[in-house]
Amino acid sequence: MDLINSTDYLINASTLVRNSTQFLAPASKMIIALSLYISSIIGTITNGLYLWVLRFKMKQTVNTLLFFHLILSYFISTMILPFMATSQLQDNHWNFGTALCKVFNGTLSLGMFTSVFFLSAIGLDRYLLTLHPVWSQQHRTPRWASSIVLGVWISAAALSIPYLIFRETHHDRKGKVTCQNNYAVSTNWESKEMQASRQWIHVACFISRFLLGFLLPFFIIIFCYERVASKVKERSLFKSSKPFKVMMTAIISFFVCWMPYHIHQGLLLTTNQSLLLELTLILTVLTTSFNTIFSPTLYLFVGENFKKVFKKSILALFESTFSEDSSVERTQT
C-alpha cells in the first residue's frame, strides 16, 4: 500500500498550494484514519498468521516462497499504517521526526513495488510451469525462486530511493509540521525559481511509478494468465478449477485495488482541488487497505465451497492453494 503523495504540496506559478487532504471534511478524515487503523490491526494479525504457516508449516517450494514474500510486502505496509492514520487525525501534522518521515515514505513505496512485482513474478512462474514444463523441471527450483525474490527486493528498493530522498518535514509559519515530498530538494520551499524543477520531477516520478508500478506489471499478469488459461482449457492441465480462479482473483484484485491510487496520483499533478480529488483519495485508502488485508484471504477461499471452508484448517486451505500442481509438472509440451 502506498499513499506517499497524499499530503504533498502542489506547485503552481505563484504559490504553494496544499493538496486535497487540507480540504477534506472532518468526517472524511475520520473515515480515512479509521480505515487505516483497522487495516493495520487486521492486516498485521492475518498476514502474520499466513507468514507463519507458509514459513514453518508447509514444504518450501517455489509457490510458497513467492507467496511468502508477496504477503511479507503486505505485512510491512500494514505495520506503518498507524503513523499515517495518526497524522490524518491531527490534520496532517507530523510529530515523528524527519528520519521517520523518510523511512515511512520509503517503506510505503517499497511495499507497493514489491507487491506488484511479486504478483508479476507469480504470473511468470505459472506461465513457465504451464507452457514450458520441461524447462521448469530442470530449472524451476527453490534456489531459482530465491534469486527471483532477491532481484525483486533489490529492484523495489532501488525504485524507492527517490521517495526516500525527496521526503522531508516542512514547518509552516503556524508551527505545523508536515511530512511531504520536496521534489527540488531545496530548503526554500516557496522559491519561484524551483517551482518548474519541482513540477518536472513530480511528473517524472508519477510517470515512472505508473509505468513500472502498474501498467507494465498489469500487462505481464494479463499476458501470462491469458496464456495459462488457454493452455489449461486446451489440455485440462489442472485437477481442479481453483488455480485458474486464483489467477482471475489476482488480476481483478490488482486492477481494482491499484487503479484508484494511480488516478489519484495523476490528479495530484493539477492544482484543481475538486471533489473528485477528495473522493479518489478516500477510494484509494479503502481499496489499498482492502488489498493488504483481504487479498491473501481471497487466494485461500476462492474456489472453495463456502460451507466447507469452516471444516478445513488453515493449513489445509494453504496446501490446497499454494501447493505445487503435480499434474502440470508432469505434462510435457
From Swiss-Prot:
Topology, Cytoplasmic side: 54-64, 125-143, 231-246, 304-333
Alphabetical list of SUPFAM superfamilies matching this protein: Family A G protein-coupled receptor-like
GO aspect biological process, one term: complement receptor mediated signaling pathway
Keywords assigned by UniProt, alphabetized: Cell membrane, Disulfide bond, G-protein coupled receptor, Glycoprotein, Membrane, Receptor, Transducer, Transmembrane, Transmembrane helix
GO molecular function per UniProt: complement receptor activity; G protein-coupled receptor activity
Extracellular side, ranges: 1-30, 87-103, 166-209, 269-283
Transmembrane annotation, as ranges: 31-53, 65-86, 104-124, 144-165, 210-230, 247-268, 284-303
Cellular localization per UniProt: Cell membrane
UniProt topology in membrane: Multi-pass membrane protein
CDD domains the record matches: 7tmA_GPR33
Gene3D superfamilies: Rhodopsin 7-helix transmembrane proteins (1.20.1070.10)
Family, per entry: Belongs to the G-protein coupled receptor 1 family.
UniProt-recorded name of the protein: Probable G-protein coupled receptor 33
Gene that encodes it: GPR33
